[in-house]
């Protein structure tokens, strides 16, 4: 089978590997779609922590069942999506129902080889039947689930003022589910094309260009009260620190992105506003189900997918996805 390796930062290669045998208790999946996310781009550019090379990237996956264990609810040919967070099931986080925070987590495409392959054998508890979804929709489920989980953490309610800082794919995923919860969503970002997409396709009520006077605009939108819930999806420590100033009294600040460095905030302001600070990590099976329900109902625009390539084209075309001028939102790799 064909597999794409990131050998070193900036260097991809195609290799022929034996088709894997189905492991005990596992499902052999014929991979059909691989969504490209920021993690893959960071691996390619050499900016992903906790990673060793060479590595097969890819964790936003869909495919069809090639072979399932006896007694499985899955059958040959079923369209499936894959939860890429391989959790242990017995640590304190898993036992509390927070498999997304497993102490022994192994993420496909990061800690172990991922899905830029033709076939992958995956423990059956991480393979979800994507009934009623297209292969594209099923491959979008993972990144959308990160947004759905963040919105659940922030407990967005009807008519709340919601600010999302960062209009990349994860920020857009947050926007989708904040709008579905009834939030009045404002997006702030430096890229006009992405802000326009958020307003045109995702239901954002307001968009603000990052730069001089942006805080005044945010104040005007909320009549000076600022926001009930603020989400950071930038992965930038300075932006994360600045985000505290956008939270209204009694509001919540949800950090969806993660950085390796420390961040700081003004403690008197934090206490004066009685701010709630939350982290949001990965997603749980419940979030995946929530996303698939929304996809089946036609509530998520497939226009999020802007670029496509075949698996065999990845070594030659992948670098183009890193160019801001290309207007990439979500790249999708197709496996014949």
What are these regions (language model features)?
Residues 60, 78-79, 93, 119, ...:
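Residue-level marker of beta-strand positions
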């Amino acid at each position: 089978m064909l597999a794409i390796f990131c050998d070193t930062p900036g260097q991809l290669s195609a290799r022929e590997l034996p088709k894997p045998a189905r492991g005990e208790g596992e499902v052999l999946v014929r991979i059909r779609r691989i969504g490209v996310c920021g993690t893959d781009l960071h691996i390619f550019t050499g900016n992903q922590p906790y990673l060793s090379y060479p590595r097969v990237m890819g964790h936003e996956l869909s495919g069809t069942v090639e072979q399932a264990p006896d007694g499985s609810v899955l059958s040959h040919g079923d369209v499936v999506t894959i939860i890429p967070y391989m959790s242990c099931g017995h640590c304190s986080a898993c036992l509390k129902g927070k498999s997304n925070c497993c102490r022994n987590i192994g993420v496909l495409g990061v800690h172990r080889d991922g899905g830029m392959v033709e076939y992958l054998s995956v423990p059956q508890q991480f393979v979800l039947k994507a009934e009623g979804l297209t292969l594209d929709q099923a491959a979008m489920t993972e990144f959308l689930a990160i947004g759905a989980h963040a919105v659940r953490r922030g407990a967005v309610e009807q008519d709340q003022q919601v600010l999302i800082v960062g209009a990349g794919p994860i920020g857009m995923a947050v926007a989708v589910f904040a709008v579905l919860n009834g939030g009045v969503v404002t997006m702030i970002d430096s890229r006009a094309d992405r802000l326009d997409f958020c307003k045109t396709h995702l239901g954002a009520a307001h968009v603000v260009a990052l730069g001089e006077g942006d805080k005044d605009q945010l104040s005007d939108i909320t009549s000076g009260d600022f926001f009930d819930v603020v989400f950071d999806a930038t992965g930038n420590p300075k932006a994360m620190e600045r985000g505290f100033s956008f939270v209204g009294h009694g509001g919540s600040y949800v950090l969806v992105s993660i950085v390796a460095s420390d961040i700081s905030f003004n403690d008197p302001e934090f206490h004066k506003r009685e701010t709630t600070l939350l982290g949001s990590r990965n997603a749980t099976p419940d979030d995946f189900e929530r996303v698939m329900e929304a996809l089946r109902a036609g509530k998520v625009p497939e226009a999020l997918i802007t670029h496509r390539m075949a698996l065999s084209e990845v070594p030659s075309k992948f670098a183009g996805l890193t160019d801001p001028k290309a207007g990439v939102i979500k790249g999708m790799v197709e496996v014949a």
